[in-house]
């Protein structure tokens, strides 16, 4: 999961959006 939602899909293994 990303620590910050705005990072989802931008380098996260498991997007959390």
From Swiss-Prot:
Keywords, comma-separated and alphabetical: Disulfide bond, Hydroxylation, Secreted, Toxin
Subcellular location: Secreted
GO molecular function, one term: toxin activity
Record text about domains: The cysteine framework is III (CC-C-C-CC).
Expression by tissue: Expressed by the venom duct.
Modifications the protein undergoes after translation, according to the UniProt entry: Contains 3 disulfide bonds.
Lineage: Eukaryota, Metazoa, Spiralia, Lophotrochozoa, Mollusca
Protein name: Conotoxin reg3c
4-hydroxyproline PTM sites in chain numbering: 5, 15
Record-stated family: Belongs to the conotoxin M superfamily.
Principal subcellular localization: secreted
GO CC annotation, single: extracellular region
């Amino acid at each position: 999961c990303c620590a910050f939602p705005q990072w989802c899909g931008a380098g996260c293994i498991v997007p959390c959006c």
